[in-house]
Swiss-Prot record:
InterPro entries: AAA+_ATPase, ATP-dep_Clp_protease_ClpX, ATPase_AAA_core, Clp_ATPase_C, HslU, P-loop_NTPase. The keyword NADP does not apply. It comes from Staphylococcus aureus (strain bovine RF122 / ET3-1). Residues 178-192 have a biased composition (Basic and acidic residues). One of its GO terms (molecular function) is peptidase activity. GO terms for cellular component: HslUV protease complex. A double ring-shaped homohexamer of HslV is capped on each side by a ring-shaped HslU homohexamer. The assembly of the HslU/HslV complex is dependent on binding of ATP. This is ATP-dependent protease ATPase subunit HslU.
Length: 467
């Protein structure tokens, strides 16, 4: 697995995060250092490697200030498997709900997909060539071979030849005639020239097995996986366009071309050495002694999480994985509780603390304009597909930021997410009418913003429901 991103310096990591996330420099620095320490550890001898564990991070800050986005972007920068879980979804062992080990299994699933996607990209040309060969045969089929009547193990029991149904490869066919060869040659040429992309072709694809709905979450998942492995793969016939068929067939051939066992082992190692687990809402399982019954349950979840953070060997469908060198990032608003309300052992497993700042009007302005694909740029691009050009003035952007900030102060503070609802509401009419106004140019001014939003933003009751 190519993890060249891990060799980035902390400054380079922060620079890449700055392309997508505004502010929160302290948090960016801490995650950048944590990533660099992983690279430093990889250069040590084996004995030293085993002694050095990642320094887990606890992010403290209200919703919508960038906690999850920093962790997710960081993982993407270095090509590390990343999973986000919510602490409130877990329950103590023995109760209905997700057990804490499921977060590790989910991370391994992500790691397997990452590794296999990269390995499949290396054989994509060969897989596509095989897919094109198959498409030629499907578009100009030859006669199928008849079922063989030899080498059947039941023959001796019944005293005669029994058709060997189901044992021939479904792709086996009679040698093509000269006429078919000529047709296939012509079809191959047309395929290469892209002239048949919209033509329909029938292909056989593996049917997605149905889910078992009568069991609990974890039992359901484990039983489903076991049944999928035991039962033969059922194929169904579908009629699709040639371009879609090529993708389906190429993906299937790529699966056959890569070494699945080797990919699984590589994925397990990647999860162990590079995996990042983001545990959100960890403040919700902190105990503050207000409700003793709930406190017992919350402490149970914390104590179940603790061994995972300390280092446990977890059984997955791909093999065992050790969590000792995974990086865990806890996050929470800690409005009601405090980090000190976590059990002492769990506090000790998050030695790095970082407090994220609440967002100001200036931050909202920067969020709307600075990131690589900011919200303003997103809406401009979407409406441009309808040939509608939207121009936001600087004053209008400032007015949007002021309204978002004020609504956050007057109602629930949901941080930067408020900008999504504000922009969506403001552009609702324009988005609806855009298909019927090609080549239009719309200037978004402070007056336009106020016309669309002022009556709502100044009414606290309406703001709470609409914005």
């Amino acid at each position: 697995m190519d993890t060249a991103g891990i060799r980035l310096t902390p400054k380079e990591i922060v620079s890449k995060l700055n392309e997508y996330i505004v502010g929160q420099n302290d948090a960016k620095r801490k995650v950048a250092i944590a990533l660099r320490n992983r690279y430093r550890r990889s250069l040590l001898d084996e004995e030293s490697k085993q002694e050095i564990s990642p320094k887990n991070i606890l992010m403290i800050g209200p919703t919508g200030v960038g906690k999850t986005e920093i962790a997710r972007r960081m993982a993407k920068v270095v090509g590390a498997p990343f999973i986000k879980v919510e602490a409130t979804k877990f329950t103590e062992v023995g109760y209905v709900g997700r057990d804490v080990e499921s977060m590790v299994r989910d991370l391994v699933d992500v790691s397997v997909r990452l590794v296999k996607a990269q390995k499949k990209s290396l054989v994509q040309d060969e897989a596509t060539a095989k897919a094109n060969e198959k498409l030629v045969k499907l578009l100009v089929p030859s006669m199928k071979k008849k079922a063989s009547q030899t080498n059947n193990p039941l023959e001796s029991l019944f005293g005669g030849a029994i058709p060997n149904f189901g044992q021939n490869n479904e792709d086996e066919e009679e040698p093509p005639t000269e006429e078919i060869k000529t047709k296939r040659s012509e079809i191959k040429r047309q395929l290469e020239e892209g002239k048949l992309e919209k033509e329909k072709v029938r292909i056989k694809v593996e049917q997605d097995p149905g889910a078992l709905g009568m069991l609990g979450t974890n039992q359901n998942q484990q039983m489903q996986e076991m049944m999928n492995q035991l039962m033969p793969k059922k194929k169904v016939e579908r009629e699709v366009a040639v371009e879609t068929a090529r993708k389906i067939l190429a993906d299937s051939y790529a699966d056959e071309l890569i070494d699945q066992e080797s990919a699984n082992q590589e994925a397990l190692e990647l999860a162990e050495q590079m995996g990042i687990i983001f545990i959100d809402e960890i403040d919700k399982v902190a105990t503050n002694n207000h409700n003793s019954g709930q406190d017992v349950s919350r402490q149970g979840v914390q104590r179940d999480i603790l061994p995972i953070l300390e280092g446990s060997v977890i059984q997955t469908k791909y093999g065992t994985v050790n969590t000792e060198h995974m990086l865990f990032i806890g996050a929470g608003a800690f409005h009601v509780s405090k980090p000190s309300d976590l059990i002492p052992e769990l506090q000790g497993r998050f030695p790095l603390r970082v407090e994220l700042d609440s967002l100001s009007v200036e931050d909202f302005v920067r969020i709307l304009t600075e990131p690589k694909l900011s919200l303003i740029k997103q809406y401009e691009a979407l409406l441009q597909t309808e040939e509608v050009t939207v121009n936001f003035t600087d004053e209008a952007i400032t007015r949007l930021a002021e309204i978002a900030y004020q609504v956050n102060q007057d109602t629930d503070n949901i941080g930067a997410r408020r900008l999504h609802t504000i922009l969506e509401k403001m552009l609702e009419d324009l988005s609806f009418e855009a298909p019927s106004m090609p080549n239009a140019v719309v200037d978004i001014t402070p007056q336009y913003v106020d016309d669309k939003l002022k009556s709502i933003s100044t009414n606290k009751d309406l703001s709470a429901f609409i914005l």
